[in-house]
């Protein structure tokens, strides 16, 4: 999707000079007037609910996703509830320069991040060797490369503002995933990367949390091509509740948030089973979803 730059604000070129000192412009001082929370993948599902929760708790938002119309509708909804209208940045995180475009849009608005929520992600159902290779690499672009880029690109702002980073993983990241191999592997990366960043950012006062939900009834299921009706027992935590738990977990600086009792026990239970057994069980589960 073609990204349309936000209109840049004209900034006065005021300058200061004293006792022969070199002139310094306001632009060089780079005064930032407002802090915002950037949420990726905000146009649907958990991303939309996260936007609602953050806005309800007084955060000014910047929203990004591919679908500009949905972002605008959400921004108008949140503004109608009394908050300041979120900044809307329509772009596709599969594009290699998406991070640069987002950073430029935020700079043009004169804002800086105090929270970053890397929610965007997708998967496709079916054996990796049978699916389109470009499609599979696209999963890595969004779920891994873009998340890494934004986390590192804005780390200095999170440090400066003593903010927080919420990366959306999945309980799938604790498992091997035949039938959704690239997606499962991408979420394993998210968990490992986020836990490592947590240790690195802790001395700087930045909260870092990874959200690991199970299957949630959102548009993700349809896009992934997962058959309907097979996840009913696990679809017990609505997206809105997932978002509420994620927000509370981030504010409490929890290492990980796993919504739902059945999901919470997964990482613990896996310790007691051989890896081969887990692989076979996951493979059977995925075949049942066809």
How should these model regions be labeled?
Residues 57-74:
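Conserved glycine-rich Rossmann-like NAD(P)H-binding loop of the short-chain dehydrogenase/reductase
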């Amino acid at each position: 999707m073609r990204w349309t730059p936000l209109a840049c604000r004209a900034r006065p070129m005021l300058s200061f000079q004293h006792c022969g000192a070199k002139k310094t412009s306001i632009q060089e001082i780079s005064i930032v007037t407002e802090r915002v929370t950037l949420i990726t993948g905000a146009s649907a599902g958990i991303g939309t609910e996260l936007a609602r929760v953050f806005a309800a708790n007084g955060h000014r938002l910047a929203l990004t996703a591919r679908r500009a119309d949905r972002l605008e509708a959400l921004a108008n909804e949140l503004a109608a509830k009394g908050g300041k209208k979120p900044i809307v940045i329509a772009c596709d995180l599969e594009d290699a320069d998406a991070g640069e475009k987002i950073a430029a849009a935020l700079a043009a608005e004169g804002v800086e991040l105090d929270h970053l929520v890397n929610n965007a992600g997708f998967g496709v159902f079916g054996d990796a060797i049978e699916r389109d290779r470009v499609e599979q690499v696209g999963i890595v672009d969004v779920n891994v490369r873009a998340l890494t880029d934004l986390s590192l690109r804005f780390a200095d702002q999170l440090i400066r503002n003593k903010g927080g980073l919420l990366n959306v993983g999945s309980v799938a990241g604790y498992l091997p995933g035949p039938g959704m191999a690239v997606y499962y592997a991408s979420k394993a990366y998210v968990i490992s990367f986020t836990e490592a960043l947590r240790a690195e950012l802790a001395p700087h006062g930045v909260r870092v949390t990874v959200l690991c939900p199970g299957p949630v009834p959102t548009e993700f299921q349809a896009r992934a091509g997962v058959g309907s009706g097979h996840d009913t027992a696990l679809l017990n935590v609505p997206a809105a509740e997932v978002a509420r738990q994620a927000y509370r977990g981030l504010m409490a600086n929890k290492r990980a948030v796993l919504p739902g009792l059945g999901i919470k026990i997964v990482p613990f239970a896996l310790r007691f089973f051989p890896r081969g057994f887990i692989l076979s069980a996951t493979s059977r589960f995925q075949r049942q979803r066809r």
